[in-house]
Each structure stands twice: as structure tokens, then as C-alpha cells.
């Protein structure tokens, strides 16, 4: 009898060959192909799964790029802030008249350390300067750098007040301690804001008077200081150190204090770069009329003890802030002029060297500067 007829008749020609194999007949090449495909259905799927490996790698790299922080931060344009409503004279804010102009100080914003994508975007933005974070931190923490900047702002305010009052010829009352230098004889003896009124029994009315008297001594001498500390009179004796050149050193930076008291309430801003702006605002606030004559004037630059304008950082970003604020004039230290011109556009920028050159620039732009110098002298 024919074996083919003994096999059950299954539907479909392909499965007939499998049935024959099960009954003991030899399998042909076609039979093997059919039965192998049905016994291992995941072979093709395993092959296709390898296609996802490159995609997974890309996803991992994208996540890593967003997570990884570089050593760089972005310096962005900040603001141009008017000082009129922030200044105080003898504890009072001077009244503003309609139409008065203003002196604006300029800021920059420093971001946190950038990730890879932020870094790439900053590279494409002409308004942003990329710098190593250590430029701001000095290798320390951001919090420590922030505290140093706030201290620098306070010192700058006092120097600006002294410079303005000196320019106006106001009567002075002594030498105020601006900075106490660590590791010097003054460190454990004098405090910031101590008012020195006499040195070795000689009355002093200014910082220069005090320095001259100290320099009459030699290293190793005892120097007697008459000090007003928070309204309490004290006599403090300090043994002078050597400044490295054979001259007496006590270890303080001094600033002249005046009968008139001026200050500015600025919160959350650090660094010394508003010094020249504060100096000009103090001069305006202490004298009659509107020095700006309705002009909006942006100013940047450190104010140094001799009244000169010290260079500052971030000037391209500050020029952008001034331009966006639509001010009439921007004053910058001479050393920063080229930096300002790179981003100032149509804004008029004038280089200054000291207080007088800044006032001259304001006068040439239409301000009222006549009769200011020495106007508070007795």
C-alpha cells in the first residue's frame, strides 16, 4: 500500500510535508526550511534589536551633555539702574524734580557653570562672554567670592563719598578705616569704620594727614591712635611693622570722613565698578539743581583714592545694557573705551580719566557743571 495514502490529509500543502515527516518519511530540503522557521520565531527579532544600539548611545550622550558641567560661566548684559532714588544725604533722600536726569550704574550678570549645550549656545551669542569660573572665584567658592564683592562695593561707596565731598570742598573730621589688612599690626586692634582723629597726639582731619603722621615713625615704634569707635572715644597703641622698604606700617587703608554724610542703598550688587557713577551722583545730590540737566547718563569705572577712574571688567556687556536702556551718554575709563565701542552701536561713548574729565564730558553733552568744585567749602 502507498505510504502517502496512509498519512492523514491535513489542510494546506505545506503542512502535508510536515505530517509525512512525523510519520517517519525522510524530510526534503523544503521540509527542513518550513519546520526550522516555525520552531525559532525570535531569530529575526534578535537581529533587528541590534538596530537600537546606536540610538541608545545617542540618547546617553545627549543626557550626559546636559548633565556635565564645564568650568566656564557666561557673562551676560545686566541692567542700567538709576541712582537718584537710592542716594541719601544725612539720612534723607533728596526730593526729585520732574524732568531731572539721572546717573545710571551698569551691571553684568554672571551665570552658573554651563553644561555642554549652554556652552555651545553661548558661543553663538555675541552678547555673551565666556570666561573661566576661576576669574570670578579666584579658585575659591562662589559664596566667598560673593562676600568679597559685597565688601568691595561697600568700600567703593565710601571712597566715592569721600571723593565727591573732597571735590566739593566739604569740611572733613578725620580718617576712617576702610580696610584692615590681615597679618598686620592693625588686624587685632582696628575695625572697619573706626574714625582716627589723632596720631601720636597730632590731630588729623583726613586720610593723607594720618598717613603723614604714621610715616614720622619707624618700624618698631609704638604709634598712639585716638579713635572714635561707634561714638566711643578710645586710645589704641600699635607697634609699627616694616612695610618692606624700611618705613612704618600699621596695615589699614584709610579714607577721609566728612561732616556731611552721604550713602547709597544698593542691594545684591557687588564689586567696585560703580564707584565713578556713585561719585557723580553724590556730587549731584549734594549741590543745588540738576547736574545732568535732564540727561540720562550711564557710567562705569572704579573710583581710586586719587580720584582717577580705574578700569573694570564686563564693559562690552555693560555697553549693551546701556544701549538697551536708551541712555543719552555712556562714560567709561579710558582703558575700556575700545571694549565699549565693540557693542555700543549708535550710543555715544566718552572715555574719562578722573572726576573732572567725567564732569567735563557731562558739561559738553549739555549738563550743568559750573561752580561745583569747592562749592561746599566754608
What are these regions (language model features)?
Residues 1-49, 129-133:
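Terminal targeting segments of Actinobacterial cell-envelope proteins
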Residues 18, 27, 190-191, 217:
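Short, well-ordered loop/turn sites that connect or cap secondary structure elements
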Residues 212-254, 341-377:
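PDZ-domain C-terminal substructure recognizer with occasional recognition of PDZ-binding tails
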Amino acid at each position: 500500500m502507498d505510504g502517502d495514502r496512509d498519512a492523514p490529509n491535513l489542510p494546506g500543502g505545506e503542512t502535508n510535508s510536515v505530517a509525512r515527516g512525523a510519520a517517519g518519511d525522510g524530510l526534503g530540503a523544503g521540509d527542513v526550511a518550513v519546520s526550522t522557521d516555525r520552531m525559532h520565531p525570535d531569530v529575526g527579532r534578535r537581529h533587528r534589536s541590534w538596530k537600537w544600539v546606536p540610538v541608545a548611545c545617542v540618547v546617553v550622550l545627549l543626557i550626559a551633555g546636559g548633565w556635565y558641567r564645564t568650568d566656564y560661566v557666561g557673562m551676560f548684559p545686566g541692567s542700567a539702574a538709576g541712582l537718584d532714588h537710592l542716594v541719601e544725604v544725612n539720612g534723607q533722600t533728596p526730593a526729585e524734580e520732574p524732568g531731572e536726569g539721572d546717573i545710571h550704574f551698569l551691571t553684568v550678570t554672571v551665570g552658573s557653570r554651563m553644561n555642554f549645550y549652554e556652552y555651545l549656545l553661548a558661543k553663538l551669542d555675541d552678547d555673551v562672554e565666556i570666561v573661566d569660573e576661576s576669574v570670578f572665584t579666584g579658585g575659591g567658592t562662589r559664596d566667598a567670592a560673593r562676600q568679597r564683592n559685597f565688601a568691595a562695593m561697600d568700600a567703593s561707596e565710601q571712597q566715592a563719598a569721600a571723593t565727591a565731598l573732597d571735590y566739593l570742598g566739604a569740611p572733613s573730621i578725620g580718617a576712617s578705616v576702610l580696610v584692615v589688612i590681615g597679618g598686620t599690626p592693625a588686624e587685632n586692634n582696628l575695625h572697619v569704620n573706626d574714625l582716627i582723629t589723632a596720631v601720636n597726639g597730632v590731630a588729623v582731619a583726613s586720610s593723607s594727614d594720618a598717613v603723614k603722621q604714621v610715616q614720622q615713625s619707624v618700624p618698631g615704634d609704638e604709634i598712639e591712635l585716638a579713635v572714635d569707635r561707634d561714638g566711643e572715644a578710645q586710645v589704641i597703641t600699635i607697634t609699627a611693622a616694616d612695610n618692606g622698604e624700611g618705613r612704618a606700617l600699621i596695615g589699614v587703608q584709610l579714607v577721609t570722613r566728612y561732616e556731611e554724610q552721604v550713602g547709597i542703598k544698593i542691594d545684591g550688587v557687588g564689586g567696585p565698578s560703580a564707584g565713578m557713577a556713585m561719585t557723580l551722583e553724590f556730587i549731584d545730590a549734594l549741590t543745588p539743581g540738576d547736574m545732568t540737566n535732564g540727561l540720562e547718563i550711564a557710567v562705569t569705572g572704579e573710583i581710586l583714592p586719587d580720584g582717577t577712574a580705574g578700569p573694570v571688567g564686563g564693559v562690552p556687556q555693560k555697553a549693551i545694557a546701556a544701549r538697551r536702556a536708551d541712555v543719552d551718554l555712556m562714560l567709561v575709563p579710558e582703558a575700556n573705551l575700545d571694549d565699549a565701542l565693540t557693542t555700543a552701536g549708535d550710543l555715544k561713548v566718552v572715555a574719562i580719566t578722573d572726576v573732572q574729565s567725567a564732569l567735563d564730558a557731562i558739561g559738553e553733552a549739555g549738563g550743568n557743571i559750573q561752580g561745583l568744585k569747592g562749592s561746599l567749602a566754608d
